[in-house]
Regions:
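Short S/T/G/P-rich N-terminal loop/turn motif that feeds into the first structured element of a domain
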Residues: 27-31, 59-146, 177, 216-225
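An amphipathic, aromatic/His-enriched active-site/gating alpha helix that lines ligand/cofactor pockets
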Residues: 29-54, 85-91, 151, 177-206, ...
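Short, solvent-exposed loop/turn elements at beta->coil junctions and helix N-caps
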Residues: 9-13, 158-163
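The feature marks the first
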Residues: 1-37
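Short, conserved secondary-structure transition motifs
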Residues: 12, 53-68, 206-216
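Short amphipathic alpha-helical segments
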Residues: 1-4, 40, 131-154, 190
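A structural signal for short secondary-structure junctions
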Residues: 152-153, 163-167, 197-198
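Short, well-ordered beta-strand segments in beta-rich or mixed alpha/beta enzyme
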Residues: 14-28, 114-119, 165-189
Length: 225
């Protein structure tokens, strides 16, 4: 499964909250289900007990391009949600999808450590992320992104959307060769507006990568290097 032609899987030895964490990247839900079924057929599955899971799809933040597109359409006098408006948006999405295909279908980074956590945006009576104008959401997310870009050389981030699929709205996967980077990055991001005011975080899961060839060593109490 680690090198499946239909996608990739990665195994991590977890710290604190469990023993194993498996990450599956596939291009369809059917393929994800097949990965589940294949895992259940392994002899190892007799010794596994599911304690947590998360289902989501890779999602790209397109606030800047969306704001520009909406502004252009309004300036042309095109009515929001009209057939002309919808066609323009669909055409733009198709172009962006092709241009961003490597980001939509990434490889699982080869980094030694992973940190995963789910998150929501506040939507209460006092603070509601979804009631903000898109221009304001764009401003805050741009500020948020500036922090992440400062860590671009040391951590790989993959954001997934899970509204309608799981209990939280997004999943965040961080990959790095130094686990302390996770703490530094997340701590620094706590101070930007979108995190300090609108973010809600779930449990954090941290693990050490285990190649398939190292599973026997792990079961014998030796962490593969």
């Amino acid at each position: 499964m680690e090198h499946d032609v239909k996608g990739q899987s990665a195994l991590f030895s977890m710290l604190a909250k469990g023993d194993l964490l498996l990450v599956h990247f596939r291009s369809s839900f059917d393929q994800l289900k097949q990965a589940e079924l294949e895992l259940a057929r392994l002899r190892l599955s007799d010794f596994l007990e599911l304690t947590s899971s998360y289902l989501s799809v890779i999602e790209l933040g397109l606030y800047e391009s969306s704001v520009k597109l909406f502004r252009t359409l309004r300036e042309k006098g095109i009515e929001p949600h009209s057939s002309e408006w919808n066609t323009a948006i669909e055409d733009t999405i198709k172009r962006q999808t092709e241009a961003m295909r490597p980001r939509l279908f990434p490889q699982i980074p080869a980094s030694r450590y992973i940190c995963f956590y789910p998150m929501d945006r506040r939507r209460g009576e006092d603070k509601n992320w979804y009631s903000l104008p898109i221009e304001e959401r764009q401003r805050q997310m741009e500020e948020h992104g500036l922090v992440g870009r400062r860590y671009a050389g040391t951590v790989k981030q993959i954001i997934t959307g899970s509204i309608g699929f799981d209990d939280w709205e997004w999943g965040v996967d961080l990959f790095a060769d130094d686990p302390l980077i996770f703490k530094k990055l997340i701590y620094e991001m706590r101070f930007d507006e979108v995190s300090a005011v609108y973010a809600l975080f779930g449990k954090f899961f941290v693990g050490v990568r285990v190649p398939a060839t190292g599973l026997e060593d792990l079961c014998n109490g030796k962490l593969p290097q």
